[in-house]
Design a protein with these regions (language model features):
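Short glycine-/aliphatic-rich beta-strand segments at the starts of folded cytosolic domains
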Residues: 35-36
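Glycine-enriched, solvent-exposed interface loops adjoining structured elements
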Residues: 1-30, 40-69, 74-89, 94-146
Length: 146
């Protein structure tokens, strides 16, 4: 049976909102863990303008900061650098780390996904009965009586 991961649900929700960018860093960020450097940002709408992504969110999807989300304080276009309001707990964001760029807080998207799951549970629930260890009912046969 196929399953859909939370990352896929978040991606689909974000795409429907017109709010999904998956990118990869191209250089190491600062040692304080408050910057992300990616030349791919220039290709996004407004990517050549300073502070184009101010107030957006970065969600790390690989590396030592996987799963952490930070709000963007500023964007410096000539260095392709996003500066976050709070440092990532895993330290500097290295090069070749994948991340998502969101206009809306990914945590709120996860809350929306959780609410949708709660609302849809009785209608989409598919019971699974594991019968891999069921053999037969020998205990109730009369031949086994003492």
């Amino acid at each position: 049976m196929a399953t859909t991961t939370r990352a896929t649900l978040r991606q689909r929700l974000s795409e429907e909102m017109g709010d999904y960018q998956s990118l990869t860093t191209t250089s190491d960020g600062n040692s304080a863990g408050t910057s992300v450097v990616d030349t791919g940002l220039r290709n996004l709408p407004g990517g050549a303008d300073d502070d184009a992504f101010e107030g957006w969110y970065i969600l790390a999807t690989s590396g030592s900061n996987t799963g952490e989300s930070r709000r963007i304080k500023s964007y410096i276009a000539n260095t392709n650098t996003l500066v976050t309001q709070e440092a990532f707990s895993g330290g500097a964001v290295q090069s070749l780390v994948t991340y998502e760029l969101h206009q809306h807080d990914p945590a709120q998207k996860h809350q929306a996904i959780n609410r949708a799951i709660e609302e849809l549970y009785p209608f989409l629930y598919l019971p699974i009965r594991d019968e891999t260890i069921v053999v037969d009912d020998r205990l109730t046969e009369p031949a086994w009586r003492c």
